[in-house]
Structures are given as C-alpha cells and as structure tokens.
C-alpha cells in the first residue's frame, strides 16, 4: 500500500499560510507555490540512491557521493501543476518534463483527458506527478492511469493540499503510489472543493477567473 507523507517543516507551513490567504496576489502566490514546491522536492528526493566517488579538491582527494544515475521525470497535471514544476526543477534540473491535460466536468466532477505528452523513455524513469490540489482524486487517478498505460512503473504524487476523500480514492486505485502533501485538509464540500482549501489554484497562479 502506498504511503502518505505530510511535510510539517516550519518553512513549508509558513508559506502555505500565505498561499491560503485570499488577499495574497497572483505574483506572490506564484512565488510562494514555487518555493514550497522546491522545499517539498527536497523532502521527496531524500531517498534517492547515491554512489561513492572520489573528487579532487584544491588540497587533496576526498571521498564523496553523487546521485546513482537514477532517471527522474516530472509530469504536471495541466494547468495548475505547471506552477510547481520550476520549483522542483531547481533541485532536479536534469529531470525530463511531460504533461497531462485534464479538466473537471462541472456537472459530474469527473476528469476529462484532452492532452498527454510524456518522455519517450518514461518506463526507465521514476515519475513525480504534480498537482497543487488533490480533491476528489479523479484527476490524479486518471493522470496516473494514463502514465502507467504508457509504461511508467514507479510513480509518486506530489500535491500542496488534499482532502481525505481524494487521498483514499487514489490509494484504493493506485496502492503502489506514494502521496506527498504540504497539508491534509478537513474535507470536500458539496461542490467537490477542498475545505478550508486555497481557492482555485490555477486561477490564482495565472490571474484568471
């Protein structure tokens, strides 16, 4: 069964407070999301394998460690997931980036797929699926399914916030996928929105309504 990790690092929680604040403007919101994504990436990559090497310093030769060649891929769910990609890439600049486009039908709350573009060698990569909000779990489920269908075997899901209902849906459908969060919120309301939430992440990132 996939694990759920909620990061309680003080910097993440401090910045998340201002991300939630309805008075935070688009520019600051975008910058805060970028910063939290970078901090979360630091935690998510904590278990990456390393290998021993020797490096020549200006003084002598020192035993050191480098990443053991593990390939990573980032797959934001369009469009809100785009707001977190640059923050992650600051720590993992060599990661390839794919995209999955989904929108939520306002009547059924179910996701509709309209775009999928992934790295050609996705089956060789550990994939981090990125979406700021995990609400009903439908979009994450469909995105993960689309990625698995194209050959990915190792997948993690990274979100700023989630509702317990959405987490359970993803865990049931994809028990092999670990979920990483900055916060677990209380619940979904009758319209499928996360409470207390942070509003519509895509609109707040891109200044749209």
From Swiss-Prot:
Gene3D superfamilies: 3.40.50.2020. Uracil binds at residues 194, 199-201. It catalyses: UMP + diphosphate = 5-phospho-alpha-D-ribose 1-diphosphate + uracil. InterPro entries: PRibTrfase_dom, PRTase-like, Upp_B, UPRTase/APRTase, Ura_phspho_trans. 5-phospho-alpha-D-ribose 1-diphosphate binds at residues 79, 104, 131-139, 200. Allosterically activated by GTP. SUPFAM superfamilies: PRTase-like. Binds 1 Mg(2+) ion per subunit. The magnesium is bound as Mg-PRPP. Its EC number is 2.4.2.9. Pfam families: UPRTase. GO terms for molecular function: GTP binding; magnesium ion binding; uracil phosphoribosyltransferase activity. Its cofactor is Mg(2+). GO terms for biological process: UMP salvage; uracil salvage. Keywords: Allosteric enzyme, Glycosyltransferase, GTP-binding, Magnesium, Nucleotide-binding, Transferase. Pathway: Pyrimidine metabolism; UMP biosynthesis via salvage pathway; UMP from uracil: step 1/1. The keyword GTP-binding applies. Belongs to the UPRTase family. HAMAP family: Upp_B (MF_01218_B). Catalyzes the conversion of uracil and 5-phospho-alpha-D-ribose 1-diphosphate (PRPP) to UMP and diphosphate. This is Uracil phosphoribosyltransferase. It comes from Oceanobacillus iheyensis (strain DSM 14371 / CIP 107618 / JCM 11309 / KCTC 3954 / HTE831). The gene is upp.
């Amino acid at each position: 069964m996939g694990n759920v990790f909620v990061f309680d690092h003080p910097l993440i929680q401090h910045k998340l407070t201002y991300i939630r604040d309805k008075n935070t403007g688009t520019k600051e919101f975008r910058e805060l999301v970028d910063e939290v994504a970078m901090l979360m990436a630091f935690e998510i990559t904590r278990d990456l394998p390393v290998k021993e090497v020797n490096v020549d310093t200006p003084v002598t030769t020192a035993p050191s460690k480098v990443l053991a060649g593990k390939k990573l891929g980032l797959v934001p769910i369009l469009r809100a997931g785009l707001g977190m990609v640059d923050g992650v890439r600051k720590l993992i600049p060599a990661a390839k980036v794919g995209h999955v486009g989904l929108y939520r039908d306002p009547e059924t709350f179910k996701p509709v797929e309209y775009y999928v573009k992934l790295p050609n060698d996705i089956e060789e990569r550990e994939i981090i699926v990125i979406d700021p909000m995990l609400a009903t779990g439908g979009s994450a489920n469909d995105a993960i399914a689309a990625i698995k269908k194209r050959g990915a075997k190792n997948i993690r899901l990274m979100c700023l916030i989630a509702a317990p209902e959405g987490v359970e849906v993803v865990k049931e459908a994809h028990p092999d996928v670990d979920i990483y969060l900055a916060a677990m919120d209380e619940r979904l309301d009758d319209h499928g929105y996360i409470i207390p939430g942070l509003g519509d992440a895509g609109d707040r990132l891109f200044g749209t309504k």
